[in-house]
Design a protein with these regions (language model features):
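Flexible, glycine-rich beta-alpha linker
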Residues: 124-126, 152, 166, 173-199
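Alpha-helical substrate-binding/gating segment
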Residues: 188-206, 211-238
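Conserved Rossmann-fold NAD(P)-dependent oxidoreductase catalytic core, especially the SDR/UDP-sugar
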Residues: 103-150
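Rossmann-fold cofactor-recognition segment
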Residues: 37-51
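NAD(P)H-binding glycine-rich loop region in Rossmannoid oxidoreductase-like domains
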Residues: 47-96
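N-terminal Rossmann NAD(P)H-binding glycine-rich loop of SDR-like oxidoreductase domains
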Residues: 3-23
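Catalytic helix-loop patch of NAD(P)-dependent Rossmann-fold dehydrogenases
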Residues: 95, 130-176
């Protein structure tokens, strides 16, 4: 597949691009700064400008392409975003994330791109950046859990899910096959961060409360994107993306007793089972995370 990948210069994007390339996909990185990965054409644009998005999606991306007309994209992967609150002002975070996502999905729709995969977030569940302590409505948290966040970043992601759902419905109404999958990505961890950060999480599990005690290896996130590229015909779907185990040393039953007293338990919490359910992704697209921290720390 030829993939229009936004945000490939970021923490998650760099790993995802490499996983896609290893699977044989041709990836063009769209960002504001270069990623510097070998054999990766790049276009540096402002995704909040719809004209620039449409232009980038319809032009040549590399000198090797110039013997023919610009090639269409087979898929769009949209990871670009202001990555959290408290980087700039809240309004700018919300505006940039909502506008860029609308522009990317609209361009994909108008150009007939059959698949869009976009980064949503664990924050949509309203725990991560909540004002004060907010516990999940139940655990493990699955995709049916309410999404009523307090912060501008998570609000932008909720809006982006609505945008995606609406464009997919519009395509279906027009009789067009267009799949749009949203990834509610948990805290992304690079390989070097296991030794760097996880001893502190083992010593003080409370540090992971706002992340619902979960995490996702950056390489496994790339695998999830590959799984979504390989799975057609689902229409609009959202998927939790995390590793199968928790990010703390304490057994999950103990974590629930300590931090989630009174919270209904709706699934198995044996061993170090994640509190961020990925059953849907495993069943519907074949997601099977391979990397974890327990053999390294």
């Amino acid at each position: 597949m030829r993939v229009f990948f936004t945000g490939g210069s970021g923490k998650a994007g760099r790993y995802a691009i490499q996983e896609l390339q290893a699977a044989g996909h041709t990836v063009v990185n769209i960002d504001q700064v270069p990623c510097g990965l070998p054999d990766t054409p790049e276009l540096l644009i402002d995704l909040t400008d719809p004209g620039q998005v449409m232009g980038a999606m319809t032009q040549w991306a590399d000198f090797d392409e110039m013997e023919d007309a610009p090639r269409a994209y087979d898929a769009v992967v949209h990871f670009a975003a202001v990555p959290r609150v408290m980087i700039g002002d809240d309004g700018s975070c919300f505006r940039a994330n909502v506008a860029s996502t609308y522009n990317v999905i609209e361009a994909a729709y108008k150009l007939g791109v059959p698949k869009v995969i976009f980064a949503s977030s664990e924050t949509t569940y309203g725990v991560c950046f909540a004002q004060g302590e907010v516990k999940p409505a139940y655990v493990p948290v699955d995709e049916d859990h309410p999404t009523v966040p307090h912060d501008s970043y998570a609000m932008s992601k909720v809006c982006n899910e609505a945008t995606a759902r609406s464009f997919q419905a519009r395509a279906a109404q027009a009789g067009r096959a267009m799949d749009i999958y949203g990834l509610r990505i948990n805290n992304v961890i690079e390989p070097h961060e296991y030794v760097q950060n996880f001893p502190a999480f083992v010593a003080d599990p409370a540090l992971r409360r706002r992340n619902i005690f979960a995490y996702i290896d950056a390489r496994d996130l790339g695998q999830m994107v590959n799984c979504c590229l390989a799975t057609d015909g689902l229409g609009y779907e959202v998927f939790n993306v995390a590793n199968e185990d928790s990010s703390v040393g304490m057994p999950s039953v103990e974590v629930a007793e300590t931090f989630y007293a009174g919270v209904p338990v709706k699934g198995d919490l044996g061993g170090h089972t994640t509190f961020y359910a990925i059953d849907k992704a495993k069943k519907m697209v074949g997601f099977a995370p391979e990397h974890g921290w327990r053999d390294l720390v």
